[in-house]
UniProtKB/Swiss-Prot annotation:
InterPro entries: Mss4-like_sf, Mss4/transl-control_tumour, TCTP, Translation_control_tumour_CS, Translational_control_tumour_p. GO terms for cellular component: cytoplasm. It holds the Pfam family TCTP. One of its GO terms (molecular function) is calcium ion binding. The lineage of its organism: Eukaryota, Viridiplantae, Streptophyta, Embryophyta, Tracheophyta. The keyword Glycoprotein does not apply. PANTHER family: TRANSLATIONALLY CONTROLLED TUMOR PROTEIN-RELATED, TRANSLATIONALLY-CONTROLLED TUMOR PROTEIN. Residues 1-170 form the TCTP domain. This is Translationally-controlled tumor protein homolog. Its main location: cytoplasm. It is found in: Cytoplasm. Signal peptide: none annotated. Belongs to the TCTP family. It comes from Fragaria ananassa (Strawberry). The gene is TCTP. Keywords: Calcium, Cytoplasm.
Amino acid sequence: MLVYQDLLSGDELLSDSFPYKEIQNGVLWEVDGKWVVQGAVDVDIGANPSAEGADADADEGVDDQTVKVVDIVDTFRLQEQPPFDKKQFVTWVKRYIKLLTPKLEGEQQETFKKNIEGATKFLLSKLSDLQFFVGESMGDDTSLVFASYKEGATDPIFIYFAHGLKEVKC
């Protein structure tokens, strides 16, 4: 199994269990998320509680709480952040480029520098529709993960900066 960690914080942000599609000249990865239900599941095993001596109205101590979560957010314990306005986002991108560029090597660094402007413009065009997430450590100087919904979709897509991820074999 491959896990993708944030190069800046070391937080696990993605794994190969979630296939990605390269967009914006490979600078961004798009990953499909899904809403899933977690918690107790009501299973009817065909038993008759009254025949077993149990009170039909009695709570048998089972917590029937179910929660809908997005699989990627839950799996990697992503933490949602407040939305950014254009000025805040541009400030974050500039700081991110400054922090990430020295960690990249040779061709990877050149590709990142060459294509980051287009990727930034792409994200700026969707800014009002994006949700922002960071990894579990919630550091200020880390990669952001962006989520949005395509028109008419019920499940979100997640967008990652590909160059900000380090592949680790587990």
